[in-house]
């Protein structure tokens, strides 16, 4: 074994080659010059260190297994020289073991040329790698003490600090460059996408504007065509163009209603008025000339006035009916007994005739006054209410013949009471009509409903009847 080692060393000296260490890796590293402390002036520092380490006599064969100990930073498990002696005591020195360890010296030639990966390994992490490349078994590494391990770690960290920093900077710069280039590429693609989106939006806006212009132009053409068609169709219907505009609503209206609406602007029937109003409202936006606008406004005003008149009559009727009912209720409760003598003084000649008839009634039937006042008031109120309804609401004028027939059927006492109460009620209603005529604007609807003239006619008829009855009584007395 010693001869084999000596032969290798002699060949290395002759060829100036050190096969016991990774010479190619260490020589290429830039930190090797700064990290080396023990180096002679000669260029072959490996052999000097090798001769120094091989000077130990008894353990020469074991020291040849690790001839790469030129400095402390090359091996992470390097400790004091005493530690190597302790390690070698436990290892078995045999020929096949030495041959396997010598074969391991050729393996570092395949390892990559960057030594930073080995320097960055943690303490104790290169145990399996050192077994393959450096030939130190796992059993021998466990013998190292903790103090020796810490000391070797501190030396390795001090020697390889600059090399590790430089290696980290060298490795981070290219990776950062790759990341920045990828980011720049993605940024450029995003900008291109945004530009494409903006161009699409502008194209769509231009397209919408073009479509709107086409729509307005076609709408104008359609309006002109409708006017032309209406001008061609007007002579067939014998109606002027200004009274009617061509529209789909107008097409749905029958020909009869169209001619009626064109010929008669305002119809009395309530069914044709809504049709005419709807036709005018639809054609109001499509007027041809200002004359049409004026005519349509006049028609609208006339229709509004007709609607007001239609609503004013029922309101007046309801108002009058309410007042009559209230008056009759007051009469039944004897609220206006104190005012019963006033109408007779104001009437003049009709009251004198009624007084004469009342005096004759007192002379002929003295027992009739013995009736209860409640029965007389109820009967008078009922008959006056019926007469008011007939005269005011229904507008029926009683003829003299019918009055004569009803007077013949009734008793003379009952007849005189009825005539007397009818005169009083008609006089009160006429006074109310005069008060409403002279009152505020709330009685305008009552003035439109002509009830006073009807009651005056009824009073004239009643006066003639009373005159005839007075003459009859005088003839009987004679």
Curated annotation (Swiss-Prot):
Biased composition (Polar residues): 260-290, 335-362, 371-380
Coiled coil: 182-219
Disulphide connectivity of cysteines: none
Keyword Protease part of the UniProt annotation: no
InterPro entries assigned: Tda11 (IPR031388)
Modification Phosphothreonine, positions: 239
Protein family (similarity comment): Belongs to the TDA11 family.
UniProt name for this protein: Topoisomerase I damage affected protein 11
Biological source species: Saccharomyces cerevisiae (strain FostersO) (Baker's yeast)
């Amino acid at each position: 074994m010693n001869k084999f080692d000596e032969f290798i060393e002699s060949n290395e000296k002759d060829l100036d080659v050190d096969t016991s260490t990774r010479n190619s890796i260490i020589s290429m590293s830039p930190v090797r010059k700064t990290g080396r402390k023990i180096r002679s002036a000669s260029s072959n520092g490996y052999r000097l260190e090798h001769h120094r380490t091989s000077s130990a006599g008894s353990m020469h064969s074991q020291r040849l297994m690790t001839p790469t100990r030129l400095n402390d930073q090359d091996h992470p498990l390097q400790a004091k020289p005493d530690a190597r002696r302790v390690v070698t005591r436990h290892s078995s020195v045999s020929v096949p073991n030495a041959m396997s360890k010598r074969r391991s010296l050729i393996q570092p030639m395949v390892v990559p040329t960057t030594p930073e990966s080995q320097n960055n390994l943690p303490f104790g992490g290169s145990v399996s790698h050192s077994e393959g490349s450096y030939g130190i078994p796992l059993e021998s590494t466990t013998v190292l003490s903790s103090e020796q391990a810490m000391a070797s770690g501190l030396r390795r960290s001090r020697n390889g600090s600059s090399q590790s920093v430089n290696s980290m900077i060298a490795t981070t710069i290219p990776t950062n460059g790759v990341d920045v280039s990828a980011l720049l590429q993605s940024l450029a693609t995003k900008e291109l996408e945004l530009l494409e989106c903006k161009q699409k939006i502008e194209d769509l806006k231009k397209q919408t504007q073009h479509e709107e212009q086409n729509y307005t132009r076609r709408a104008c053409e359609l309006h002109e065509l409708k006017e032309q068609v209406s001008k061609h169709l007007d002579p067939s219907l014998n109606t002027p163009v200004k009274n009617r505009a061509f529209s789909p609503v107008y097409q749905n209206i029958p020909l009869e209603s169209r001619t009626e609406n064109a010929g008669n602007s305002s119809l009395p029937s309530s069914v044709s008025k809504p049709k005419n109003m709807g036709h005018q409202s639809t054609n109001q936006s499509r007027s041809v000339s200002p004359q049409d606008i004026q005519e349509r406004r006049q028609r609208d005003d006339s229709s509004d006035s007709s609607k007001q008149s239609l609503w004013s009559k029922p309101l007046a009727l309801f108002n009058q009916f309410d007042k009559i009912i209230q008056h009759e209720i007051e009469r039944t409760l004897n609220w206006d007994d104190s005012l019963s003598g006033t109408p007779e003084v104001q009437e003049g000649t009709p009251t004198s005739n009624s007084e004469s008839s009342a005096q004759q009634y007192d002379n002929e039937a003295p027992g009739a006054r013995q009736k209860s006042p409640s029965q007389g008031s109820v009967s008078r109120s009922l008959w006056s209410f019926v007469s008011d309804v007939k005269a005011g609401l229904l507008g029926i004028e009683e003829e003299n013949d019918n009055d004569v027939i009803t007077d013949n059927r009734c008793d003379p006492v009952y007849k005189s009471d009825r005539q007397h109460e009818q005169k009083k009620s008609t006089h009160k209603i006429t006074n109310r009509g005069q008060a409403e005529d002279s009152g505020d604007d709330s009685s305008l609807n009552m003035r439109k409903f002509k009830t006073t003239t009807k009651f005056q006619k009824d009073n004239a008829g009643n006066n003639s009847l009373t005159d005839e009855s007075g003459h009859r009584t005088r003839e009987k007395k004679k």
